[in-house]
C-alpha cells in the first residue's frame, strides 16, 4: 500500500480554515462591488454582484479544466484539505513521501497547490452565491413590506433563482469531493463539468433578468 492509498479520503479537520479562506477571497469582490456602486439601489448592486460572480465562476471552470489537464486533480488525494491540512504547506512531509514512493505519480508540491487553489476559489464562489441568495431574499422582502409608491424594484427576478443556484453550487461541491475520492472516475468528472455548465447557465439567467 502506497502513501496515497493509506490517506483517508475524507478529513474534515481543516474545514474551518478552508471556509475562512473562501470568505477572505470573496471579500475582495464584495468590497469592490459595494464601493463601485455606493449610493445606487440594492437592485443595481445585486446585478453587479451577479455579473461579477458569473465572471468568477467562468474563471473557476477554466481553472478546473487546467487542474484536470495538468494532472493535478489528485495533487491532494483527500478532501477537503490536503493530507488533513488547510494548505500544501502543512502537508510538505506527506507530499514528499508520496512523491518519493511514486516519482511519476499524481502527487507533487506543484500539483497540490493547483488543486488547493481550485478548492479555495470554489469556496469563495460558493460564498458569493450564498450572499446573493440571502441578499435577494432580503431585498424582495423589503419590497413586499414597503408602500407601493416607494418600491424601487429588483426587476422581474424571483428570489427562487438565487436559492436554486445556492442548492446547485452545494451539489457541485459534493461532486467536486467525489471527483477526488473516486480517483477521477470519468463519469463523475463529466458530471462535475456538466454541473459547472448548469451553474453558469443559472447565473446567466439571473444576470440578464435584473
Stretch-by-stretch model annotation:
Residues 13-20, 113-131, 188-201, 205:
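Membrane-interface loop-to-helix entry segments
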Residues 2-3, 69-116:
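Extracytosolic (periplasmic/ER-lumenal) interhelical loops and adjacent juxtamembrane/interface segments
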Residues 178-191:
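Membrane-interface helix caps and helix-loop-helix hairpins in membrane proteins
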Residues 45-50, 153-166:
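Membrane-interfacial loop-to-transmembrane alpha-helix junctions, especially the N-terminal start
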Residues 1-13:
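Short, strongly hydrophobic alpha-helical membrane anchors
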Residues 49-71:
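N-terminal signal-anchor transmembrane alpha helix
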Residues 15-35:
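Hydrophobic core of alpha-helical transmembrane segments in multi-pass integral membrane proteins
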Residues 29-40, 133-142, 205-210:
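Structural signal for the C-terminal ends of transmembrane alpha-helices
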